[in-house]
Amino acid sequence: MSDRKAALEMALRQIEKQFGKGSIMKLGESADQRVSVISSGSITLDIALGAGGYPRGRVIEVYGPESSGKTTVSLHAIAEVQKQGGQAAFIDAEHALDPAYASKLGVNIDELLLSQPDTGEQALEIAEALVRSGAVDILVVDSVAALVPKAEIEGEMGDSHMGLQARLMSQALRKLSGATNKSKTIVIFINQIREKIGVMFGNPETTPGGRALKFYSSVRLEVRRAEALKNGTDIVGNRTKLKVVKNKIAPPFKQAEVDIMYGQGISKFGELIDLGTDLDIVQKSGAWYSYNSERLGQGRENAKQYMIEHPDVADEVERLIREHHGLVDRKEPVDFEEGQDEDLFAE
């Protein structure tokens, strides 16, 4: 062994002795180099994300205009984690979570950990404690804009607090990013949008909380309403566009379109009709939809209703779509303890 190799081996042993086993290794030595993911609860979004869902141990930002479906998208992710036996937590800084609606989306509200903090510091300290426990699989913070620094709450109404929230987020993310990776927790920050004053060219929209979240996020998801869905004259939901603005685990800028129905969330059956038609799994002739020579209905809404009434057909179409895109079957159990080490967070 050359002197250089011997010196390197000695340095590696010293590092492992000081910081623990696994603190440094060759990249090819890791047991599984693929990024572990959890389904977003929407097959269309899973495809757009590229890897089949949200990456575990990463920070995700979901942002968009008011009432666009940001919280709905996040609650579907929570429901998916709970279905696989994982633990979920929701930090409701906006104090606006509707338990009845969450329950309709499939969230087990009896098992969901909920915190409604008074200040931004309190919210982020609770988030850090939950992540460092290593026992929470998904954590949603709703929203970054509502994480008000303590100094602002205790100050007068007209006081200027320039940059306080950005500094708070920057410090929190520096502490959270490493712990999130070790605990394999998915941390979703919901964010609002604001407009920059005096922008003549380019997009005037920005998100509150400074630039730190943009840098630390592995996935940034933009949620926007495209059009209203009507049943006769009644508006029953929204056609919603989901754009993957940033993606560190797959090619970015892919888009997904989903139906978000009022009181029901993302319409799985609408997704199956759209994706099935694109792949010619579901055939469309004029206004009629059919599958395996069996007519599903005239018009998209009637075809959706057929899927609702015939879950066996829906399951078969979903299986074929997932096979085509190489996605993991939702029913496969996830080992949430895989890759976690109870000694990682020991002081």
UniProtKB/Swiss-Prot annotation:
UniProt-listed GO biological process terms: DNA recombination; DNA repair; SOS response
Gene Ontology CC annotation, any one: cytosol
Pfam families listed in its UniProt record: RecA, RecA_C
Disulfide bridge map: none
Native organism: Exiguobacterium sibiricum (strain DSM 17290 / CCUG 55495 / CIP 109462 / JCM 13490 / 255-15)
Keywords for this protein: ATP-binding, Cytoplasm, DNA damage, DNA recombination, DNA repair, DNA-binding, Nucleotide-binding, SOS response
Protein localization: Cytoplasm
Residues given in the record as ATP binding sites: G64, P65, E66, S67, S68, G69, K70, T71
Gene: recA
PROSITE patterns per the UniProt record, alphabetical: RECA_1, RECA_2, RECA_3
Gene Ontology molecular-function annotations: ATP binding; ATP hydrolysis activity; ATP-dependent DNA damage sensor activity; damaged DNA binding; single-stranded DNA binding
Record field: transmembrane: none
InterPro entries xref list: AAA+_ATPase, DNA_recomb/repair_RecA, DNA_recomb/repair_RecA_CS, P-loop_NTPase, RecA-like_C, RecA-like_N, RecA_ATP-bd, RecA_C_sf
Name this polypeptide is given: Protein RecA
Family: Belongs to the RecA family.
